[in-house]
Amino acid sequence: EYGEDFPYEQIYAEKRKLAAAYIEEHGVPAKPGLHDCLAYAQSRHICCAVASSTPLVRIRQYLEQLAVLPYFELIQSGEEIERGKPFPDIFLTVCSKLGTEPANAIVLEDSANGLRAAAAAAIPSVWIPDMVDIPADVKKTVWKELHSLLEVPAALEELR
């Protein structure tokens, strides 16, 4: 859309640098309902995992800053996965490591590629929009669309 000369890599690197500087100064912003959602899952003995393309060191740093690291039984970084999202590999790896069938898992996602990966893994997904909308074809693959993590406990109750 911007042409072959568009310096995507340079701009993306600058964006990462600015984001890292912001987080260094202000900390990681918690999504509304994060702690309540994780406390609900823990109270219902629902296993939680992180499956992110972010480097493992950074994932752990963010989870520690948010004081939520103990809620997660597994943290899976895309660094250790050959093919990233939208391929299903990261989600299938998490299911395998946890001994869970994909049909018995749920993916909470805010990105189109994450939702595509969940669909490719045959894992029901919940889309919680962030800053970017997703294409209509991806929306069709979503089990539920919620406005925030505050709504996740009620959605999970529907499955019980």
Model-derived features: positions:
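N-terminal-biased segments
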Residues: 1, 48, 63-66
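Conserved acidic
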Residues: 7-8, 26, 86, 110
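Short, acidic loop-to-helix structural element flanking the phosphoryl-transfer center
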Residues: 21-50, 56, 60
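Residue-level "hotspot" positions that anchor or transmit function at local structural transition points
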Residues: 29, 50-51, 82, 99
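Asp-based, Mg2+/Mn2+-dependent phosphohydrolase catalytic module
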Residues: 35, 39-42, 56-160
